[in-house]
Structures are given as C-alpha cells and as structure tokens.
C-alpha cells in the first residue's frame, strides 16, 4: 500500500520528532478561551506550557457546541456569558507563543467563516499559531481553508474515528498536516474511566497509509491513562479533565498537567 508522506512544511512536525527522540508521546492540552474569564484562561494556558504540555489547543467558545461533552460545554457557556471573542483566542495564542509554547486553535467552523477564512489564517499566523483543529469540517468542504493554510503555513488537523470508511480515512489523512486527531466516536468528548480498545486499531489504520503523527483524544484524566495511550499514539490529547481541574484553581491544573506529563514519559506498550 502506498504510504502518504507528511509535507516537510508541517509546523508541528518538529515537536513530534523531538518527542519521538525522547521515546515518548507528545502531551496536547486543551482549554477554552475565557473560562473562567479571559485573563485566567490565558494564565492557565501558560501554566500548561510550564507544566510540560508540548502543544496547547486553544478553544474558541461557540454557542452550538455539538461535539463537546458536558464539562467543556459548561465552561463554554461561562466564557460566552463573559463576552469572549475570537480575538481573545488569538491573543491567547500570542501569549502562549511568547511564553515559549506551541499553540493550535480548536474551533467549530462557523466562527472562522464569520471572521473570514483568509483573515483568520492571516491573524493566526501573525499570533504565532501553528495550526487549526476543525472538528466539524471535513476535507471535502475545506477547499478555502486548505488554500489559506497553505498560504500562511498553518497545520490542518482533521478528525478520524473508528467509523471512518477506508476512503474517508485516506482522504482525511491526506488533507491533514501536523497530526490527525483520532477519536473513539465521532461525537461527544469527555473524561472516561476506561480507555477504548477500538482506538489502537484506528491508529494502526492511519499508520498503514501515512507517516503523519496521530493524536488521540479519549477522555484521558490520569497519569496511567496517559501512559497507556502514549504507548501507541504520537500524541495524548487531554481536554475535559484539564477544564475540570481549572475549575478548582490554577494549582490543581498545574498538578494534573505535571501528572499527565509524567504519564507520557512512562508510556505503557500494549
């Protein structure tokens, strides 16, 4: 089978290369801009950088978050009530970059359309962003974004799920750059006690067609889960658990991030 090789222009490629050299997965932490307020959310993202997160996913709160679990949905509501704007997310990306971190934005597609696809790509590049995670955008409908991301050297992170057909998987992986975001179901996110067994098979399916890095979002909330997923994935993505920890304050967030960072460094091979 032909293997799709990742473009050398990937902004996040060197991050994954560095982690592989350390024989570990990358830790990718998600927080929404504006929770519990904009300044605290930015401080929290910088805490993640300082606590060992290799990539920060900066969320754009959206009023119709169809794929968010209850923890992130509640945080998004708080952020929207506080008046958060897309420009606050771009400012957060800039702050992360200035702190020595690497940021990607995670957003539903509608806010980008409203902002303007080309303008958003331009401003994300200017802020020091590395790419965009688009959970509700499929490559077939992403022509404008693909063109803008090429112009502004931004990585494109699309989602794959166990339900992805072979054709859909190849199409999605081929359109992605930086990493592919693997989920257990194409649906709601959230922390879980047990990690799914179908996702290692999904990662293997991606690896059969491409050398792109694969990040896994599976509701991770413990060092042990981070170690387990880090045994087969290139990146361990944590969202809901970090949002919950932030609800208890920055010290709790830092403690969890440090625990997860230790987890990816003691990967457990299946």
Swiss-Prot record:
PROSITE patterns given in the database record: TRP_SYNTHASE_ALPHA
Short name of any one Pfam family annotated for the protein: Trp_syntA
Listed GO CC annotations: cytosol
Disulfide-bond pairs as recorded: none
Reactions mediated catalytically: (1S,2R)-1-C-(indol-3-yl)glycerol 3-phosphate + L-serine = D-glyceraldehyde 3-phosphate + L-tryptophan + H2O
Location of the active site: 57, 68
Biological or metabolic pathway of the protein: Amino-acid biosynthesis; L-tryptophan biosynthesis; L-tryptophan from chorismate: step 5/5
EC number(s) from the headed UniProt entry: 4.2.1.20
Assembly description: Tetramer of two alpha and two beta chains.
Entry's family note: Belongs to the TrpA family.
Protein name (record): Tryptophan synthase alpha chain
Gene field: trpA
